[in-house]
């Protein structure tokens, strides 16, 4: 079974997305970046449930660090937080959340406020959460010690090896995707990752074109599986079984 653990289905044009989903067999975790993103992913999931029983879409609610400035003030409004908590209760896991000191224009203070708000929920409910760490790896590593019952999944880590080793020591699962085949650093991290902490992703539809590739279709996850299999020198069928087992350990 193919499992794409991190995508942004709401970024696609629906007239391009739906024909692909109707042919896909597997599981797609549809990460959200804010409220509207989550509601769009839920609508996509509802549509595909009626047209392709072999394609399971899992919408997850989160607020990306890029959206922190707009959303941090909303967390002081009880009506809004009640609505957000309803979305969180509906989500089998939480994401995309985190901090970004490289590309995000949101203030570090607002990023941390939003991140901690979600971590507090995950800590209370023991739900898994998918975390964006770009250039904020050390800060996030320290913050996570305040939430021992949250269950982080680290998305597309490409930071310092020292912090990666600490994340592995804590047992945080790691996603690897389309950049892995292009990066010796990521390949070294992949090879040092216990197989029971490994997940695959595409971060579709923007990541592959951002890296200079031409594809952004949902079947790109097949190529990611093949590339990870090659790098790890593991038969593709064995890797599929490992990733499926890891997925079910998280959800």
Residue ranges and their predicted role:
Residues 1-251:
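Mid-domain alpha/beta scaffold segments of enzyme catalytic cores
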